[in-house]
Amino acid sequence: MEGKRYSNSFTSSEMVKEEGRAAYYKLLDSVRDGDTVRIKRGVYATAEQLADTMIDVEAIVPGGVLCLFSAWNVHGLTTSLPQAYHIAVKRGRKVTLPVFPKIELHHITNTMFDIGVEEQIISSYRIHIYNKERCVCDAVKYRNKVGMDVCAEVVNSYLALPGRNLSLLFDYADK
């Protein structure tokens, strides 16, 4: 995609049209070739831009924690890209979500919510995310929902890490 990079690393078809008709047709060819992904009508991004894009979780879902597929991807425990941002909130909490980006909320009990939360800087955003050990426990806990292949990939990736903390993993598994 030859067009300029715009806010959130996405390109608008209207902005490309301003560069000229040739740039717009080049964008459409890029989509047809698979180099560019159509996010929604009039919004496009490359696969690399999608992989690098992180939202400000605290601004969209105050008190939310990145979890499941999103956390597994950040920690490098899975090779698949999440289709949505997976964010944990305390059970019973009502949250109004934007239309874009796609966010899936997971309501966690108050006793389990704070276990394994750490803070990381990702794409210049301060993000609350579950640590690797909590992510592995969640993969095993939700194995019937996420699939046995994903669960096995997360567990095997964690066990292959040199800095794994098995005692913390077993502590989380007991809770």
Regions found by a protein language model. Name each.
Residues W72-H75:
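Short secondary-structure capping/turn segments at boundaries of alpha-helices and beta-strands
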Residues M1-S70, G92, L97:
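Short beta-edge/loop segments at beta->alpha junctions of small alpha/beta modules
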